[in-house]
Amino acid sequence: MGWGAVVYGGGVVGASLVGLGWAGLWFLNRRLYKEYEERRALVQILFGLVFAFSCNLFQLVLFEILPVLSKHARFLNWHLDLFCLILLLVFVLPYYHCYLLLRNSGVRRERALLVAALFLLVFLYGFWRMGIHFPMPSPEKGFFTMPQLVSRIGVIGVSVMAVLSGFGAVNLPYSYLSLFIREIDEKDIKTLERQLMQSMETCIAKKKKIVLSKMEMERIQGSEEKLKARSFLKRIVGTVVRSVQEDQTEQDIKSLDAEVQALEELSKQLFLEIYELRQAKIAAAFSRTWRGHAQNLLGYALSVYCVYKMLKSLQSVVFKEAGSVDPVTMTITIFLRHFDIGIDVTLLSQYISLIFIGMLVVISVRGFLANVMKFFFAVSRVGSGSTTNVVLFLSEIMGMYFISSILLIRKSLANEYRVIITDVLGGDIQFDFYHRWFDAIFVASAFLSLLLISAQYTSRQTDKHPID
């Protein structure tokens, strides 16, 4: 391989990683950090690195199919990407996350560094012990090898994927089908808005009372100077009266504070309910358009596929099978078997594999980022101080999620591409186990989501008009 090929390969890899890292930083700052002020530079860099190396795994799968770059360059890129990503996930992120938690709690820098190092040792021990309960490669070459680390990361990542996929398999038809859309009366929304305004006005009035009560306490405390000029008896009586007044005022302030907190919580709930009703009203109006009807048909098709996927996963769990062929591939296979259309089947299967993997990549990345945003905004409501911790946690989950996606996507590839990924990840990895594990968690998550969404839908049906 000449120097020109080396420079070209390095340029393509470097440019793609820089582009992916920039995309990760854009997503973090524009979509996640939009309403939050705390922005640590190192946290952003770590998130961008994990995002770049994670997405590069999918890019490398496409490079193998197209193909792009030489075989040797792709092989080196695989190893470099996995090495850097595992280094970040297993060593850097746990250590730095613990260090930041300690520093934010007021621990001195030297002690935080030491405690974070001890935590990393405990984390590595727990990470190693986790592999005892799952099929793992032979430990002859040691713990810190690519197959050992990828296998353990895969268990966590596949579990996260299965939970998200199980919920999505139930929630997606529920979101798309007009059957589950309820009609919202505008007067219900107006009633809620009046209640929200009344709650906010009452809250403001009580806050004013708190301010006035505090001013009254300051006035009473300021009257001590005047009491010193009076007789001894008058000072005693004044002190007793002032003490009683202060106690009563303090009790009033505490009572008002509790009422204000309750009103603020009520206002928040009313605001969220108004928002949900507005969204439901928009969805109901959209369902009556031609695009809404098309989405409804798509919802029925997706419902059939999701039911099929749940049944096949249940079959895989019950009969301990290693996963089955998806209906799209099955249909194409049957068609080509019965109809000779004069097309090279090998070439066609390669292009179909490319399209299918591309769709899997786009859907997987899009679905993961959507869930990242939901999780981020849900957790970050507790305060801006937790934003950094949430971003680091999401970086950890993101890397594990994408590595696990490669473990599962591998089975959808043609044998020639499957062998390459097997060699890179390690031939000792029990790939079939991850498919069975995914199916088991997927079925449990899907049925639990079905119960929760059914309960939610039933409660909405029994309460057509939530406002009396």
UniProtKB/Swiss-Prot annotation:
Record note on disruption phenotype: No visible phenotype under normal growth conditions, but mutant plants are sensitive to cold.
Membrane-spanning residues: 7-27, 45-65, 82-102, 112-132, 153-173, 297-319, 345-365, 389-409, 437-457
Location (main, coarse): membrane
Locations listed in the record: Cell membrane; Endoplasmic reticulum membrane
Membrane topology: Multi-pass membrane protein
InterPro entries listed in its UniProt record: ABA_GPCR_dom, Golgi_pH-regulator_cons_dom, GPHR/GTG
One GO MF term: abscisic acid binding
Record has Membrane as a keyword: yes
Lipidated sites in chain (N-myristoyl glycine): G2
Pfam families (UniProt xref): ABA_GPCR, GPHR_N
Coiled-coil segments on the chain, per record: 243-279
GO cellular component, one term: plasma membrane
Keyword RNA-binding: no
Keywords from the named record: Cell membrane, Coiled coil, Endoplasmic reticulum, Lipoprotein, Membrane, Myristate, Stress response, Transmembrane, Transmembrane helix
Example of a GO biological process term: cellular response to cold
Subunit structure: Interacts with GPA1/RGA1.
Function: Involved in chilling tolerance. Interacts with the G-protein alpha subunit GPA1 to activate the calcium channel for sensing low temperature and to accelerate G-protein GTPase activity.
Miscellaneous comment text of the record: These polymorphisms are associated with divergence in chilling tolerance of rice cultivars. COLD1 confers adaptation of japonica rice to chilling and originated from the Chinese wild populations of Oryza rufipogon.
PANTHER family named in the record: G-PROTEIN COUPLED RECEPTOR 89-RELATED (PTHR15948), GOLGI PH REGULATOR A-RELATED (PTHR15948:SF0)
Family: Belongs to the Golgi pH regulator (TC 1.A.38) family.
Protein name according to UniProt: GPCR-type G protein COLD1
Taxonomic lineage from the root: Eukaryota, Viridiplantae, Streptophyta, Embryophyta, Tracheophyta
